[in-house]
């Protein structure tokens, strides 16, 4: 039977900044226990009779599946609302939607552009609200990534070094920087300066680091940024919903920050691991990949296929861990 942290009962999960280091670590530990129980066939169903609404204004594979399977494993039911299936923000205000769904459901997940929208849902729903991704933060992904790091390193979190390469201005860059700072890790943001997180986010990270002992580096130098790293991380250069017109500019700016085998060798760590939240443009196996090849002559973007398919890559362990960590959030807040 897992040890459920009662301090998180009834809490929202909106961004990493809302949690203490102890609370965040507690969710990682709970996820590891739930994962082990699922594999052993000894999982306890803590959420029998619960109902969870899943609002997706942005499409998803991993996040939707993780919430649905996590809920089902725990005995809860889910209702999926896509943009065509709900009136949120169109015919009905976020505030009113929150108050309606809060009367019917025990928890609400939201995935879309606006952090303001998920915060407003939380303010008026009266039940726990979960951020499945916004433009600013991706907290459920951070739980999965940190769990994956603990599984693939024999070091404690405070001794783990990871480097994030690429566009760090939005949710993934913000979340990696703040999460690493919160947990006392050695976190490096490696990108052109114009692609660094906003100064407000950097300042918040430095304040967290002062308390946790984290080491924070922001650099344009790839060799400096990855030296000694145990994990190299990246994300897509063009985010969901962005127009194709931005591709050329992004590719020109970020091409030196693509994760190649040379980048992994530059860590000096033969056991370095590669993480990516997915989907990844590492080959020509997608429609978007084909369009990029036709327009720019590139067979990969943020990571080469050689790295993606190598023994260094743990991206599918990371993807699986979305399930176990989201389950931990549901159990901790609703059990």
UniProtKB/Swiss-Prot annotation:
Location in the cell reads: Cytoplasm
**Principal location class:** cytoplasm
- Pathway entry: Amino-acid biosynthesis; L-arginine biosynthesis; L-arginine from L-ornithine and carbamoyl phosphate: step 1/3
Q: Does the keyword Cytoplasm apply?
A: yes
EC number from the UniProt entry = 2.1.3.3
> Which example biological process does GO assign this protein?
arginine biosynthetic process via ornithine
UniProt similarity note: Belongs to the aspartate/ornithine carbamoyltransferase superfamily. OTCase family.
User: What is its biological role?
Assistant: Reversibly catalyzes the transfer of the carbamoyl group from carbamoyl phosphate (CP) to the N(epsilon) atom of ornithine (ORN) to produce L-citrulline.
Q: What is the name of this protein?
A: Ornithine carbamoyltransferase
Q: Which organism is it from?
A: Streptomyces coelicolor (strain ATCC BAA-471 / A3(2) / M145)
Identify the coding gene: argF
